Every structure is written in C-alpha cells, then in structure tokens.
Amino acid sequence: KKSFARISGFEYFQLIRSEKIDQQGKDKIAVIVARGTIVDGVQPPGTIGGDSTSRLIREAHEDENVKAIVLRVDSGGGGVFASEQIRQELLEAKEKGLKIIASMGNVAASGGYWISANAHEIWASHNTITGSIGIFGLLPTFDRALNEIGINSDGVKTSKIDLSGDITQPLSEGLSKIIQSEIEYGYKRFIGLVSEARDIPIDQVDQIAQGRVWAGSSAKDLGLVDEIGNPVSYTHLRAHETVH
C-alpha cells in the first residue's frame, strides 16, 4: 500500500505555536491570536491558555523590534485568573511603550472583553458579539440524582457551617453565601477595570454590564468599542501607523 508523509495535527500546531518571533528586521507588529475558551495553564491552539498566551505576549514585548501588538480575540470567555493573567501581560507591554490593538472576531465577550479592555484601540465588526461583562459560578450537586437511585449519604461535623462542598449534599446556606460574595466581588472588579480602561463612569458601566451582550455597532455607541471595520486589514493599517 502507498503511504504519504504525515504529522499529527497536535504536533504541527504546537510547533507553530512555539515558533518565536523572527529576530530579523525592525519595526515589527506581533499578531497574537486568542481563540477559544480562556483557561489556566499551557493550552494548544483552539484554547486560550493563561500561561501560553501570556508567554506569546511576553516574547513580543521583550523583542525590542516589536512596536505594536495586535491581539485577535475570538472568545466567549472563561476563567477569571487566566483572563487577568493575560491582561496583566498586556499592561506590561503598554508600560514598555508598545501600541496594543484588540481586534475582535465573531465573539469577544466576558473574559474575551476582559483581555481586550486595556487595549489602546478596540476594533470590531458590526456583528461582533461583545460585552457580557459579568461573573457567574457553578457548583454541581448530585443529591437529587443519587436519591432517585436510592443512594444517600450523611456525616458529622464540628460546625454548623458546612464549607466542604460535598456534591452528594445540597448546597449549604453558608457555602452559598460565600460563593455569592465572591461572585459580587468579581463583578465589581470587572466593571471597575472596564471603567478605568475605557474612561466610562462606573455607574454607567454597571448599566451596560450585568451580563448583557451587545453587537459591535451598539458596543461602539456605548463606548465599549472604538472602531467598526474590517477587524484584520484596518487593524493592521492602524498598527502600521504606530510603527512608522
């Protein structure tokens, strides 16, 4: 049987992902694609890893020939920690004087907006879905499902406050209050960073946040987006303006 040369898709994309920015030439623009769910750690293409995406941004701002970063965002969000990790790396690039341009794809919502908010310019298309400025948390419990098949559990503890998060039991009132307070804190932090980054009063941000999603054109009217246009060609043109 005839065969052909081949390589696994995972190995191929890992090779591309790990390729460093060309060290030759000056006045370069680094284009970094952030596509997929935002999660912690090092992730393959198709998922935005807090460590791996931050590393790409770091490689860009540590290259003295790179003058601008275009962050191409196509993400519905993900984890707060990873999103903040990426945002902090972009802030480091800004501190070094690099121009940061966020180019939104089909979706740049929730965590996708979190990592875009501090860009010098945010570009989107008319139909980009963005916003979703909000925080939520989930804790699965299986007490009802287990009860249906006749499996029950019980136990003893030294406190009335149950913080164990036992998935075989209903969510306790104490743990529920703690989770709710963390969600509320995260939400205030989110609208606070958007308010500061976009220079919008925090009360106004709260009105347009609360998990609402907006089309790109509406987001521009609300001040969440700077420009509407081709999110690739126009963004590159504006990035070139900062270099030459």
Model-assigned labels for residue ranges:
Residues G76, Q210-W214, Y234:
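Active/binding-pocket-proximal capping segment
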